[in-house]
Amino acid sequence: MQLKDYEFGFADATKEYVRKPEIFKDAFCDTRNFVEKLISGYDFLLIGRKGVGKSAFSAKIQSLSLESNSKIVAQVLNLSDFEFSTFAKTGIDNNVSGTQKYKSSWDFIMLLTIYKILFNKLEMIESDSVNDILDLLDKAGFSLENEYKSDIVRLTKVKLGAGIMHFDAEFEKKYNTAPSNYLERVSVITEKMILGLKDTYLNERQVIVIIDGLDDILRYKKNRAEIITSTALLKYQ
């Protein structure tokens, strides 16, 4: 064989999955059945040194979601381009430290990501539960068509109290109570989103949100570790 007869893949699994899916499919090896554990088991955190192939499992789950008749719907949230400096402004209180400081904001961002999947990928436009939440999000200034960077910017504005008078008025009209600060506003929306999910029938489909790039982020600025550790508290059933 000559060199031209060889077909080379990529060192980066995500890039190979996108550009050379046939090579990725043949080359991927999972002798310890990690993919099945991540999809169906209780394991949710994949730890390893940089370069050992953690992102390959993310790419594999994404590839499975694209197979015909797949019940998996996957969405990746890559932390390498996450707006940490902006997100840091959404901490609930300067006097609060540790994981609780950003948990409410993370709850909101992750649940909003799930609702984007329901609306954009599963097209659940006829669900009353989903539509009620979409209306609530719209009044708060969040669009399901925006990238998550725009959501973080909007969340910061909610923290500052910008453009929320209409939301507060509509919320009070519908639920006979009005939130008075950022934590209350985010918490009530989050609570409604969770209740909406409980009333939503997925027809055995499984929604998976993959957070990638954690190891890269923790090398940098001090507040990022505090922000990231808040994700360990997230749990939705």
Residue ranges and their predicted role:
Residues L38, I189, I228-A232:
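Short, glycine/acidic-rich beta->alpha junctions
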Residues Y42-L46, R205-I211:
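Generic beta-sheet signal
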Residues K37-L38, D199-N203, Q237:
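Conserved catalytic network of the ASCE P-loop NTPase/AAA+ motor domain
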Residues K221-I227:
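Short, flexible/disordered intra-domain loops and linkers
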Residues R49, A56-V207, I217-Y220:
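P-loop NTPase nucleotide-binding core
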Residues M193-K198, S230-Q237:
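Substrate-engagement module of ASCE P-loop NTPases
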Residues D212-D216:
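Walker B catalytic acidic pair
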Residues M1-F44, L66-S70, S80:
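A short, basic N-terminal segment
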